[in-house]
Amino acid sequence: MPGKPLVSAIIIFWNEEQFIEEAIESVFAQTYGHWELLLVEDGSSDGSSEIARRYTEQYPDKVRYLEHRGHENRGMSASRNLGVRSARGRYISYLDGDDVWLPTKLEEQVAIMESNPTADMVLAPLLMWFSWTGNCQNRHLDQPYGVGRNGKHPYTDTLVEPPRLLALFLRYEQYIPSGFLAKRDVMEQIGEYEEQFRDAYSDAVALVKVCLKSPVYVSSKRWYRYRKHTASNTYLSRLHGKEDEEQQIYLNWVAAYFNQQKVQDPELLKIINKMLFRCRHPRLRSLERNLFYTTEKAFHYVKRIFWFLINLQRQKSLHTQQGKK
């Protein structure tokens, strides 16, 4: 496709036999056709490797299969690094083996990047996808992530200069999105993914590096469905009580990276110091969480009482008017 930039779509997977075919098909369903697909195997022991190899055999001009030496399991960061080193596209975008893209993702993200030549990356919220089960009772659980509590990102449909977006990410993790599209040379310039982060915070670390120095476009559209299930890394981390420990490791890395990069921005330094203080004092953090949830619960009760009284007053007014007639 002359004139259209090539996109390297990178799917990393580990034991995703149940879902990987749907992930791959979501790339083939893209309305933007100028892409290559790199399937990065991370040491699976189920049938997902065979599925990936089948696509490579059927579509050798579009799909490539990669794996670590000795079929080793090395984690998400090492697998993404393998994908980036093998990519040929002007742009790079990632998809986990259990998630899916919506059909217009690449077309619309490439259009945004081409219309904003100074942007190094485009970010967007995602859908926390519970309804993939087909159970209608799960439909109401689907919700956007990466937009904040009011349902809107503070910088929506805006090209954000560094490091404003990073300050937001560090303060509020719910604004960390997924399914981004970035310039390949930018991903190469920031250095590789940090392989100490095998699972949790793998993407967040890369975003810290990009958002510290690069202009980033924040879109309001959702192109990425993040499948929620009991075998996901997020669920297992919470189940085994590792969330706080993993966050502290991440924040310590951010502080060390700021020191390495000689960051002088007072807002960023204030935020990271505050976040580290909270992380190192779990009792204070627990108290803060409980206070937040108690306040939020009380607010909902007050809101319900308020609307009950409003409706009661309306009914009284209606009865009064009917009585006068």
Regions found by a protein language model. Give the residues of each.
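Membrane-interface aromatic/basic loop that binds lipid-linked glycans or pyrophosphate carriers
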Residues: M1, P266-K325
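Acidic donor-binding segment of Leloir-type glycosyltransferases
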Residues: E25-R69
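Glycine-rich, basic loop-to-helix element that forms the pyrophosphate-binding segment
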Residues: R69-A87, E108
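Conserved nucleotide-sugar donor-binding catalytic segment
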Residues: R85, A124, G146-H240, Q247
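Short aromatic/hydrophobic "clamp" motif used to bind/position activated sugar donors
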Residues: I92
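The conserved acidic donor/metal-binding loop of glycosyltransferases
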Residues: D96-V100, P125
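Conserved donor NDP-sugar-binding/catalytic core segment of glycosyltransferases
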Residues: T104-R149
